[in-house]
């Protein structure tokens, strides 16, 4: 499983929020370009931008001091709200998992 560790360059919630917006905008543009051209290069660009967004999410969770229980509660609440809004998960073998845990990395 691929793992992303927080970066040491963003230290405030504001910095993380701005970087998240920047990367999300770049991901949006890359996805639109891939949707239009549907080429290997545009696919790879979109994938890289999505990974950048996930890096930013990781950084934000770190800066906020989020613990694993709070993260899991937030994800469960989002799932509940999606169901209430008529948005249902697609039965698939593919699952995007974000495990927010404290590990000792040496």
Could you say what each language-model-derived stretch is?
Residues 1-106:
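Flexible "arm" and connector segments at domain edges
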């Amino acid at each position: 499983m691929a793992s992303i560790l927080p970066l040491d360059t963003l230290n405030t919630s504001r910095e993380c929020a701005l970087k998240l917006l920047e990367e999300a905008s770049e991901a949006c543009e890359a996805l639109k370009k891939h949707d239009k051209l549907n080429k290997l290069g545009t696919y790879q660009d979109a994938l890289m931008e999505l990974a950048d967004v996930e890096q930013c999410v990781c950084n934000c969770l770190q800066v906020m001091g989020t613990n694993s229980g709070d993260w899991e509660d937030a994800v469960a609440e989002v799932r509940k709200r999606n169901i209430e809004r008529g948005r249902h998960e697609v039965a698939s073998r593919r699952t995007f998992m974000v495990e927010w845990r404290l590990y000792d990395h040496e």
